[in-house]
Each structure stands twice: as C-alpha cells, then as structure tokens.
Amino acid sequence: MDTKLLDILACPITKGPLKLSADKTELISKGAGLAYPIRDGIPVMLESEARTLTDEERLDK
C-alpha cells in the first residue's frame, strides 16, 4: 500500500484516520471499530465489506 495514499485516505464512516494492519491486508479505523480489506493493493472502503474489530483489536494501540 502506497504510504502517500494512506496519508490522504479517511474512514468513510467517521472521516477519521486509518492505520495499516501489521500484515498489511487491512486498513483499520479505531473510531468506527472496522477493518477495511485491501484486495490486490486496492482498499475496499465499503462498510458492507468491512470486518468488525474484536475487543482486543479495539484496545490495541
């Protein structure tokens, strides 16, 4: 994932920042409690495609 792209992307729900997951397969929105998948290098920023974060993931800094 291009870091320049990550800098300009925002969560479509909260308009807050996104963080790249450790395995670089998801964009994490702590504010919305969602993880948006990255498929073939393209972030899928649809709420219907996002996964809900676990309680542990929500607390992880």
UniProtKB/Swiss-Prot annotation:
Lineage, top-rank taxon, reads Bacteria
One cellular component GO annotation, for this chain's record? cytosol
State the family named in the UniProt similarity comment for this chain.
Answer: Belongs to the UPF0434 family.
State the protein's name: UPF0434 protein PSEEN1604
Name the species this protein comes from: Pseudomonas entomophila (strain L48)
